[in-house]
Amino acid sequence: MLKVKRLEEFNTCYNSNQLEKMAFFQCREEVEKVKCFLEKNSGDQDSRSGHNEAKEVWSNADLTERMPVKSKRTSALAVDIPAPPAPFDHRIVTAKQGAVNSFYTVSKTEILGGGRFGQVHKCEETATGLKLAAKIIKTRGMKDKEEVKNEISVMNQLDHANLIQLYDAFESKNDIVLVMEYVDGGELFDRIIDESYNLTELDTILFMKQICEGIRHMHQMYILHLDLKPENILCVNRDAKQIKIIDFGLARRYKPREKLKVNFGTPEFLAPEVVNYDFVSFPTDMWSVGVIAYMLLSGLSPFLGDNDAETLNNILACRWDLEDEEFQDISEEAKEFISKLLIKEKSWRISASEALKHPWLSDHKLHSRLNAQKKKNRGSDAQDFVTK
């Protein structure tokens, strides 16, 4: 595989924003070229898939060389503490007609993020002083408004500590404002690319457990996220390992009898069925979970190419491996976990419930061993510092 850009350079290259890097594949010709290429070169496709065997587990609705983003990492002791719930009870929200400023003070200077939709500002409820986040979404017509109202409907159905919660909503002529739970830890993506942030396999386990718990809840509610990526996962604060999944703008209600197809998403996280414009379902999110696990463990993006076409090519060929030196000290359980998710045939991928039962996320003996190794590495690093 060709050497690819650093992930932070990739973001700039695609001229997109951290909270909403959408790539809408309206030009289907590029995908068709990739598919034609693969049909001619599919002889050894299965040997590249990163797994030798897999079984179908989706009957239950419960449900080339890559450039490293950073060097090898170690960190302080990780503590498995659940993410705190929102500072308010779950509520059913409908968009009110009127101005958000009548009830909230929206900061013009504290901008938390932004993208195709508009911007997210820090805000405060006037009556209570509750700190919140206001996502201001520009709406140019009825279609835009219906998309935002779908996001509201989705969030109304989701009540879980690892999913950001909706507090209020306001509709005016040119925009809809979603007032949401506020967290200040930044994006998980920032921790991947931050050279000063130390991340271990045990830290990754803590993140992945929470991601899978949030996705399991979504799937139990028959909702697909369809845009899972580190930019759409926020850390509760700067130091802890608790996370919350955000951005349900592309989420869809899954109805088994109604075959759903989508043609949106961020290229490097797309499942093969999205690239092929085939039917999507719960396993589509789990592919993205596999990509996130791969990135957290190694600092590498498994399918990222120099351009969209090359990235889609890699995805359709299911061309990935665990041979990079960044995986040298990673446990076999972690490698097996990834291999059960990055599978081209979606029915063979493990579900969120199965992922949480996998030894990598559930074996306390493994976690104790990784913790002991982390302490040993910390002591070794400290000794090296003293020697120098």
Curated annotation (Swiss-Prot):
Q: Name one GO molecular function term.
A: myosin light chain kinase activity
Q: Which branch of life, at top level?
A: Eukaryota
Q: Between which residues do disulfide bridges form?
A: none
Catalytic site residues?
A: D227 (proton acceptor)
Catalytic reaction equation(s): L-seryl-[protein] + ATP = O-phospho-L-seryl-[protein] + ADP + H(+); L-threonyl-[protein] + ATP = O-phospho-L-threonyl-[protein] + ADP + H(+)
| InterPro entries according to UniProt | Kinase-like_dom_sf, Prot_kinase_dom, Protein_kinase_ATP_BS, Ser/Thr_kinase_AS
Annotated phenotype, changing A78S: In a breast infiltrating ductal carcinoma sample; somatic mutation
**A GO CC term assigned to this protein in UniProt:** cytoplasm
**Binding residue positions for ATP:** L112, G113, G114, G115, R116, F117, G118, Q119, V120, K135
Name the gene that codes for it: MYLK4
Tell me the CDD domains matching this sequence.
Answer: STKc_MLCK4
Q: According to the UniProt entry, what is the EC number of this protein?
A: 2.7.11.1
Domain Protein kinase: from-to ranges: 106-361
Q: Please name the SMART domains in this protein's record.
A: S_TKc
Question: Keyword annotations for this protein?
Answer: ATP-binding, Kinase, Nucleotide-binding, Serine/threonine-protein kinase, Transferase
Query: What protein family does this chain belong to?
Result: Belongs to the protein kinase superfamily. CAMK Ser/Thr protein kinase family.
Example GO biological process: signal transduction
Tell me the protein's name: Myosin light chain kinase family member 4
Enzyme class, broadest EC rank: transferase
